[in-house]
Amino acid sequence: MKIELSMQPWNPGYSSEGATAQETYTCPKMIEMEQAEAQLAELDLLASMFPGENELIVNDQLAVAELKDCIEKKTMEGRSSKVYFTINMNLDVSDEKMAMFSLACILPFKYPAVLPEITVRSVLLSRSQQTQLNTDLTAFLQKHCHGDVCILNATEWVREHASGYVSRDTSSSPTTGSTVQSVDLIFTRLWIYSHHIYNKCKRKNILEWAKELSLSGFSMPGKPGVVCVEGPQSACEEFWSRLRKLNWKRILIRHREDIPFDGTNDETERQRKFSIFEEKVFSVNGARGNHMDFGQLYQFLNTKGCGDVFQMFFGVEGQ
């Protein structure tokens, strides 16, 4: 099913398993500004097509803010992050069962002149099934999407073909320790950026709320401030709702990870990068002692398997 995005005409012309874009198909007559405008127009269309709560999640809000700012100023200078969002769809996998399929989408700067990076996940898919689905989706995009926006085409392809990748044994028997409804659960990890975190009351709230909601992760006070929380999606959303209501100079979700899982305690613990929630105060720099040692932060993230997040936060390679 080919879906065309309607817009004003242009001038002429986190995963080895994912449908990773290869910069094979180029559209040389499309300039950078037109590419950016096409990305924003498609994102607006997706928001209207997936209006439900948690149907469309913008994982990197700063990237979208940068995109809008560049379009408004008519320059691509200052753009450092790729647009990253997740589409969650409840799909029929049998006559009596539905399951959530998540499409994690990253738009390269030159998209739609090059293909997007899309990774499809579901708790009902084995590793081999997931790999095959993503491989076939890549082949579909390479064959049918030459310089065109194609996220809606990808969602329709998944909607039509996903059930074929779920084996009969998997779809007919619930995962051990879970129920049919449990396939709708999401394990979430929020990476929150703040201009600064100094206030002792705020720091206390962060620790107490994380404990109350059974979230793991860490907070790093100072300038800038960093908070990471992970756990069931509903608990992470509640934490963010409380945190953003406090008085901040600037605070936003810099990066977001949403992973479908079966809801069992064993699976929850397996998904965690952090065993507890704690405040991390690294060796400080500066006369006031408000600036953290980012080298130590990077090393800490690396030990937790999160080193790639450092560049997403600060725009530079960690070392």
From Swiss-Prot:
Signal peptide: none
SUPFAM superfamilies: UBC-like
One matching Pfam family: Prp3_C
SMART domains with a match to the protein in the record: RWD
Keyword line: Phosphoprotein
Positions bearing Phosphoserine: S275
Tissue expression: Ubiquitous.
Keyword hit for Transmembrane helix: no
InterPro entries, alphabetized: Phi-like, Prp3_C, RWD_dom, UBQ-conjugating_enzyme/RWD
Domain called RWD: residue spans: 41-165
PANTHER family referenced in this protein's UniProt entry, alphabetically: RWD DOMAIN CONTAINING PROTEIN 2, RWD DOMAIN-CONTAINING PROTEIN 2B-RELATED
Protein name listed in UniProt: RWD domain-containing protein 2B
Taxonomic lineage from the root: Eukaryota, Metazoa, Chordata, Craniata, Vertebrata
Annotated gene: RWDD2B
